[in-house]
C-alpha cells in the first residue's frame, strides 16, 4: 500500500509542491537581503539637533537655565509642561548629570505642533490607519531620532532623541 502511494500522482504532486515552496522562500529571503533597508540610518547630518535650544550632552543646570523651572525634577529626569498641548521630558545620566534623551509630546493638531519635515526634512508616509512613525539612527552624530503620530483628528505626536550606546 505504501508503494502505491509513493508511486502515485499524489506523491509527485506533494514533492513538486515542496520544491516550489522551497524555491519561493529562498527567493523571498534573497530579495529581502538585497533590498536596501529604508530609514535604517544614514551618514548625513540629522535635521533635528535640539529641542528649544537644548542638546544631548548638556548638563542639568544648562537645561534648567534654558527651559526654566521644570514641573517635576530629579537627578535623572526633568518634566516640563509648556502648555496643555506640549510636554517634554529630559533624561539625565545619573553619574554625569548630562542629557541622554529628550522626549517631547504634542497633543492635538494645529499650529505649534512639530512636523516630520522639522524632524527629518521630509514627509513620512502614513500607514493604512493614518498613523505615522519613523526612527533614524545617526551614528556619526551619536544619537537616534524617532517621530510617532497616532491616527485621528486629535493625534498625539511624540518626538524622541536619545544618545546611542557606546
Predicted regions and their residues:
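N-terminal secretory signal peptides that target proteins for export/translocation
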Residues: 1-11
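Compositionally biased regions
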Residues: 8-9, 23-25, 75, 159
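Bacterial N-terminal signal peptides
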Residues: 14-26
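A generic, residue-level signal for flexible/boundary positions that often mark functional hotspots
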Residues: 24, 48-50
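Boundary at the C-terminal end of the N-terminal hydrophobic targeting segment
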Residues: 29-33
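A cross-family detector of function-defining hotspots
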Residues: 36-44, 48, 55-166
